[in-house]
Swiss-Prot record:
Coiled coil: none annotated. UreD, UreF and UreG form a complex that acts as a GTP-hydrolysis-dependent molecular chaperone, activating the urease apoprotein by helping to assemble the nickel containing metallocenter of UreC. The UreE protein probably delivers the nickel. It is found in: Cytoplasm. It holds the Pfam family UreD. This is Urease accessory protein UreD. GO terms for cellular component: cytoplasm. The keyword Protease does not apply.
Amino acid sequence: MTGDRPWHGQCSLQLISKTATDDLQSQLTVHQSQCTAPFKIQRANLDHDGRCQLPLLHTAGGLVGGDQLSVNVKAGADSRGLVTSVAAQKVYGSVGRSKQHPKGRWASQECHFELETNADLEWLPQELVVFQGGLYKQRMQVELQPKASFLCAEVVRLGRTAAGETLNEGAWRSSLEICRQTPIGRQWELVDQLELNSEVLQSLHGMGTQPVFGSFVWAAPHPLTADVMEILLRNCRTDRANLEGSMACGGLDQGLVARYIGPSSQAARQWFSRLWARTRQLRRLSTPQPPREWPLQEEGTFSNERFTKDHQSPSASPH
């Protein structure tokens, strides 16, 4: 927010696949971007497999009620991209209380992702912290063409527990919709709607007083066979070892979904990082390179040794 006016920041990204000039067999991804305050794109980095890593900076340092953010990403055919955030996002106590909005106004973010054939996009923002009384809602819409892959993960902390804060009248609301174009038309792959508030936080059937929630979703480029899915889920469950919290995962018709509930943002990040590496391994892609903006990961999270030691490692199409 600037003065008494809420922000309405917009960011548009386009990812384009091109042939490397020094190696006609090598593909790399470049980007075009257009942003308005408080968004700013930092310097892009290229992974060793030509994937474009884009750090997105929110210069305002946090959100308050009424702030709106819009992100639009179009990934061209055969492009590979990873979009992350430079730092954790903060949602402060809501403002603008009135008869119409007795708890204050919501801060919001709308994300739209459009992936062409064979595109591969990973949306991996850093942690979101909802302060006491903060109100935040987001909507993510994903449109996939055949053979496109979309992966996203998010970690949310409800209240600053280290400071003794609770959520009080704050809330976090999320909607994720993924659909894919097929020979018989558009098919829904996932519709996921969640709301976390103080009641859910305290409920034994909800968060059970645990302050951290995480969600991981992978829409795979191809259907996974029953055998491949069984081994993938077994490995993902094994990857929970030595991490605190409650973790569960399951298969989609064409992909993977996982949830974390617990006390530790770090544990959620570590488990999701391991799952991320599993999806890369399954497609015979390079081991993930954590963006340099991220906090240090646990030693060995992305080591080849962790994954090659499995007695059964499933493999699928490399695209």
